[in-house]
Amino acid sequence: YLLRGYADDLNLQDWLEHYIFPREDRLDGRAVKAASTLAIAEALRFGTTSVSDMYYFCDEICQAVAESGIKANISRGMSMFLGDDFCFDTFPACRELVELKDKWHNHDNGRIKIEASIHAEYTSTYQLWDALAEYAVNNGLQLQVHLSETKKEHDACVEKYGLTPAQVLDCHRVFDVPVVAAHCVHVTQEDMQLLAKRHVSAAHCPVSNLKLASGCADVLGMVKAGMNVCLGTDSVASNNNLDLFEEIKAAALMAKGKTGDPKALPAEAALMMATVCGARAQGRSAECGVIELGMDADLILLDFNQPHLIPCHNVLSHLVYAASGHDVALTMVRGKILYADGKYPTLDIAGALKELHDYAIPRVFSDGPEAQA
């Protein structure tokens, strides 16, 4: 959240290695708590009722989620490079995962779910894949991973192993549990068949993929193969906002532009990716994703009485092609109002903003010794 607008107009590798990772090294739990509170506020403002997040200092993230009332699937991002000594029981990130699962998994009747994670094939090694896959299976956890986001990443894996990232991870049982694979921009047709067989959900992030020039995911191909495809924003650092309505429209337009078919990914299908398919990917199909008797009252209201939404010949069309998160007037989770008309009844926005300006931003962006303490 702190890195919104810090590094734009770059490819993924330059963006990560030269800008994002170095600043993330300066984060601490206090900074992440303030940033997470504001990120949740932004998500609620734009009508998101449930999120998935892979990051660091997840105990503080869970605290913010618990206070806010939003639903969340949280995973501690895991990376490990060759040469690192590895033992699951002593590896710091794995110990954090265990503590996180013991403390927060299924908190508040499942409003918070803890998941395992592998940042990506190219930022980790087989020892980590094996250990996390085993832990996820034994503890009934889902798993998050970034998969084939760029052509460079995908091709390097094929050159190294003779297999695609999806095939390599499958060899190490990573897909033995429900997995959400972010991006899937360069997965092959064979990958799609494999991922569908393993019930892997793809989190399509069209705005981030376009902004980083990573490519255009073959959403129609994945759906045709039988994959569940939902939507994500990736992050404010690569997007640069959390407005899921932008993703809905971008996904529909990208599919049409990629195929040359104006009927590709029609409005209803694009909207389902943000609702039904998202709930399915999070393992929440029994509680949300549709408005139906017996489901949680996870609802949003939009103000259609505005010049850019008049006249309304087709509600679905407006939701996909004309509306934005700024049109959301109310966001409710489990029947509790979390955002309404500019107010956040469960969040201390002023306090979080003060923390961000007084502590988090100086810590991450000041080059003095206090920033690295």
Please describe what each predicted stretch is.
Residues 3, 47, 65, 116, ...:
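Divalent metal-coordination and catalytic microenvironments
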Residues 4-70, 93-109, 355-365, 369:
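Alpha-helical scaffold segments that flank or form the walls of functional sites
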Residues 41, 63, 130, 134, ...:
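Alpha-helical segments flanking ligand/cofactor-binding loops in enzyme cores
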Residues 60-190:
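Metal-coordinating catalytic core of metallo-dependent amide/deamination hydrolases
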Residues 190, 211-213:
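Helical hairpin unit composed of two closely spaced alpha helices linked by a short loop
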Residues 275-373:
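Active-site microenvironment of metallo-dependent hydrolases
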